[in-house]
Design a protein with these regions (language model features):
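C-terminal regions of proteins
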Residues: 244-313
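Active-site segments of SGNH/GDSL-like serine hydrolases
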Residues: 216-242
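Hydrophobic membrane-insertion alpha-helices, especially the h-region
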Residues: 6-24
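Short hydrophobic beta-strand that contains or immediately precedes a catalytic carboxylate
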Residues: 44-48, 281
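Acidic-and-aromatic substrate-binding clefts and catalytic sites of carbohydrate-active enzymes
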Residues: 72-75, 205-211, 237-245
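Secreted/periplasmic serine-hydrolase-like ester/acetyl group-modifying domain
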Residues: 111-217, 221, 225, 310-313
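Alpha-helical transmembrane signal-anchor/signal-peptide segments
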Residues: 26-44
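Membrane-embedded segments
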Residues: 51-140
Length: 313
């Protein structure tokens, strides 16, 4: 019996070593063959979740590239940004979205819930280092194992055929508008479910230490590579439920990020039609905000605290 168990252990250990070996080798080859250079050669980079994804229309802002993506925790933002920042020396300033919902405990859900993990591992697994993969495996082993087996199967096929023509979707500006009548009922149902979750989460006052850890890693990485970091909070309507953690949000910012410039646009003057909900801008709102932000960049005052700037559209 002992001999049998020993053989099982040796087999599993060998399998794990083989899988990690294939993962490491294929990841290195993919990174080597992938082109992370941004065609526009931007001076400014925007990172974050759905709020900046909907707010920064980079076609209206000279020298800026928006790589924000909805539902993205700082964990994935950090790993996907490393090669982009390394390979684009023209980037001088990185604007990172930092708002009330970024500190919420539910942002852990954005990292290792299977819906988010599976989708992002399939795109970014070659960018995530062993430390990050072990963390994902620890928090959701079934999803991690299933997804990585799928990824490695694809990778093995690519290794055998020498096919490394990868094109990675890293995020970007997303055009938004009011809901059309034929999708409004479905979207309203989903919105109501999310509102219940967000309402509970915003009132719990618990924070995501995990998400904040990777925000700090991202900041330190940018500094190490000579990039200025500016935190940005985007427009939010007064009815937005995450205003309830404003005290905690302010405390965390002052305790951990007080040395960084903070552009606070939370109360930026916009009309109701400039929003698609309480925290995301419509196409019209994004155009208004982006035009203002583009002018701000030209004044070179974006390194200042937003309290010293004029909030005129």
């Amino acid at each position: 019996m002992r001999t049998f168990l020993k053989k099982i252990f040796v087999f599993l250990l060998s399998l794990i070593i083989l899988l990690f070996g294939v993962d490491w080798l294929s990841s290195e080859l993919i990174i080597e063959k992938s082109d992370f250079k941004l065609i526009s050669k931007p001076k400014y980079l925007v990172l974050g979740h759905s709020q900046p994804e909907h707010a920064f229309n980079d076609s209206l802002i000279e020298g800026l590239k928006n790589l924000a993506e909805g539902g993205e925790s700082y964990f994935y933002t950090y790993y996907k940004s490393v090669e982009v920042i390394k390979k684009n020396p023209t980037i001088e300033t990185v604007f990172i979205n930092f708002s009330n919902n970024n500190i919420a405990k539910s942002r852990d859900f954005w990292t290792w819930d299977c819906y988010y993990m599976a989708e992002r591992l399939k795109r970014f697994s070659h960018l995530i280092q062993i430390e990050g993969k072990l963390k994902l495996a620890y928090h959701n082993l079934p999803c991690f194992t299933e997804t990585m087996l799928f990824v490695l199967q694809e990778r093995l096929s690519d290794l055998l055929t020498q096919n490394f023509g990868y094109s990675i979707n890293l995020g970007g500006y997303k055009i938004s508008s009011k809901l059309s009548s034929n999708t409004e009922q479905l979207e309203t149902s989903l919105s109501n479910r999310l509102r219940v979750l967000n309402s509970f989460d915003s009132k719990s006052k618990k924070t995501s230490k995990h998400n904040l850890k990777y925000l700090n890693k991202l900041i330190e990485f940018c500094k190490k590579h000579g990039k200025q970091v500016v935190l940005v909070r985007l427009p939010q309507q007064q009815e937005y439920n995450f205003w309830e953690n404003e005290i905690e949000f302010s405390q965390i910012r002052k305790q951990y990020f007080t040395e960084l410039p903070f552009l606070d646009f939370a109360k930026f003057p916009l009309e109701d039609e400039d929003f698609i909900d309480h925290s995301h801008l419509s196409y019209q709102g994004a155009c208004r905000f982006s035009n203002y932000f583009g002018k701000l960049l030209k004044t070179k005052k974006y390194h200042l605290n937003q309290k010293s700037l004029d909030h005129k559209k």
